[in-house]
Amino acid sequence: MAYNRLDDDYFDNRRPMNNRPPPHRTPSPGHPLQHGYQLDDAPYGRPGLNSASNLDIPMGPGRHTPSDQLQLHTAHSMANMSEPGYQQQPGGYRDEYSVNPEQHHDAYYNPTYTPTPNEAQTPYGEPGYEHDGRPLLPQQDSYGQYSDNPQQQQQQQGGLKRWKTVKRVPLYMGNLVLDCPVPPKLLNQFPHGERDEFTHMRYSAATCDPNDFYDEKFTLRQRLFSKPRETELFIVVTMYNEDEVLFARTMIGVFKNIEYMCKRPESKTWGKEAWKKIVVCIVSDGRAKINPRTRALLAGLGVYQEGIARQNVDDKPTTAHIYEYTTQIGMALKNDVVQLLPRQQPVQLLFCLKENNQKKINSHRWFFSAFGRVLNPNICVLLDAGTKPGGNSIYHLWKAFDLEPMCAGACGEIKAMLGTGGKNLFNPLVAAQNFEYKMSNILDKPLESAFGFISVLPGAFSAYRYIALQNDKNGQGPLEKYFAGEKLHGAGAGIFTANMYLAEDRILCFELVTKRNCHWILQYVKSATGETDVPDTATELILQRRRWLNGSFFAAIYAIAHFYQFFRSDHSFFRKIAFFIEFTFNTVNMIFAWFAIGNFFLVFKILTTSLGDETLLGTTGKILGVCFEWLYGVSLITCFVLAMGNRPAGSGPYYLAMIYFWAIIFCYLLFAAVFISVKAIMADAQRGLSVPELLKDQVVVTLILSIMSTYGIWLVASLLMFDPWHMFTSLVQYMLLSPTFTNVLNVYAFCNTHDISWGTKGDDKPDKLPSVSTKDGAGKADLPDEADLNTMYERELAVFAQKHVEEKKALTPSQLDEKQLDYYRGVRTVVVLLWMVTNFGLAAVVLSTAGLDRITPNTNAETKEQRATIYMAVVLYSVAALSGFKFIGAMWFLVVRMFRGV
């Protein structure tokens, strides 16, 4: 078979091949000097033996070529590279098949090519006589008929095959760029016509930093069409070592969204060709870290091929391997098995496989600074592998930007994945997190959206306007602040800044809204939903919340301390007043979060002590109070001990016991509150008080206020949002685990402020020693001659010829790490002590304990009781006011949404 150029009148099959160029003509992509590759089955000037079997592959825009025809002059065409992940199937192809990842894994760490072929013969003779115009093709027709005996074929193929000819691949603009034909098994599953974006995968070996990608003349396929494609939506899926099920879950949701937008023919932006305006970027954090099964799935989609990547280009190490392909293969999940479905909606895929593990923020830098600068998209959507967007959620996110020109960022509702029939709700940890997520999306996010500033747009599912992210001409701006956290390593990084950048998405939100001379706002889009897995074990939950709590706490302090930056923005006076109100609200919330552990103990102490009253439980109440106080103290001390010196992974049973202890304590608290309230109401009823008189009773008013400010507002807001089911399926679990959130998670987070890790570590490699080149068993090395020996000797003499001056040596990386860790531990001690002392002081002042009763010995019991009552009233009224404020904001969001439609 042969490759023929399509729609090219310049090529005449009746003429013999003439490599000499006509005078005054330079090569062009449409009419190259070489009119075709001379193949054994179709020499120059003659058609093949079977012209029907010729595969037409376009080589550039011809006279009648559509505007989206690719130009292949920007890449070196590599034909028929080995594809080990697939076995040829007799009798055609199956409509559906699963990925076989083991073959990819077995061959993944093999060298990318074999410089010295094992076989004695090559397809075209000796390598020294290889014709430069011949493509890398095996002698056998790779697109021919398949073997009728698959077992025999498998034996012949053996392991991973490497083509016998080693060719010199020219560089384009100093960069290695290859256009590689996709496997025949993949190609024949869908109609591809003349589009080489379907027939070829493009590989680029990036040998630069993401910030230099554009300047180093790297480009992407969308800019290589005759009419470069405009990118409206640029979607990134970041992953580390997620398996193929989690990855497929995300990609299925993305594919459904693209299909939904292609089915909107009346839209001015979308329609049948909408997929050309959408690029899906997959960034994997580390070549050694990627899950081999996920890598095999990417190969199944056509966007990855084994054996193509190169470690170095001209002695420059490759930093990222970039694969581009427009796939027509879909996916389906059946019983946690991924199946590939052919003939689906085309999707432009960009797969970036980073050479080293450099954390998620570096993956985002590749997305924004490298690829975003090339494509210049309108809207960027951020997804984590494992988060499944709803069938039209990405469209609704985009619509929010379309309706509001000043919207710089938007997020949707993050849902906890509950499994089939809600089976995951049987796990109390999942149910409690489900309730937490729901109430945050019903009260917190709508309130912040009503003001125009959302404290955090979750990186798992959010979107940004690309132009709003850009830095100013001085290099300062949102992206500059966002990526500053990537460089924080070593003792020079302060613990405050290091913890703050554990929640770098919060910093990005703050920098967007306060951008100089701009008036960008952030919005919450309830119509956009994304499902994600939540931790289902205590160990995973503790580790996750450590980063969340520390990052959000220090980022909130940063935002409050830099509130003055709002005045550099171009927001209106009333918008700035609204921001001031919101930040005041956030400050009050942060103060309550700081004193949460002290407030919880005070409520516990007051209620359990009250049960010892003679009108209630009397002596029994006193005994129970002492027992539960001891249980409380032991549990809290245990939490501190575990947090200060143990890893959660090695203390799972202890933390599980703590969860049960705190749940028992909460049950006793709930019993005390209900019992005291019922006794008070019964006493009032026996005195014959009317309803108006009952409402004047302090106990009754406190009871009603506390219930309505929490459960009442939760229920009403959930009903108004048409999402009340979590109140019936997850409320009890959340109540039982709320002491765990307050005590266990907060204690572990504050006791580990020195730990600024994300849970993943980079691949630190030792420095390489000078190498020795060997040939025929003999090594070559640079050895000094006599003159060099003399020079070196004189230099040694000069070292001690003068007085010794103390030289400050740079610390080694291990010493820097140890110094940094010691510094962080010291600051951790100060933070924990300050936190404990302030909370203990609050409890001592309210209860007149810890020696304060000796300072004021004349204080009677009635005064102490009155002080405790006043404190309880302040707490309850504050909680009620904060909840009411959230409710008002959520209602305003609901009213605005009725008119906006999003």
Swiss-Prot record:
Under the GO molecular function aspect, what terms does this record hold? Answer: chitin synthase activity
- In residue numbers, the region (Disordered) covers 1-68, 104-161
The topology of this chain with respect to the membrane is:
Multi-pass membrane protein
The UniProt regions of compositional bias labelled Basic and acidic residues, in chain numbering, are: 1-15
What this protein catalyses is:
[(1->4)-N-acetyl-beta-D-glucosaminyl](n) + UDP-N-acetyl-alpha-D-glucosamine = [(1->4)-N-acetyl-beta-D-glucosaminyl](n+1) + UDP + H(+)
Q: Residue spans with biased composition (Polar residues)?
A: 111-121, 139-150
Where on this protein are sugars attached?
80
The name this protein goes by in its record: Chitin synthase 3
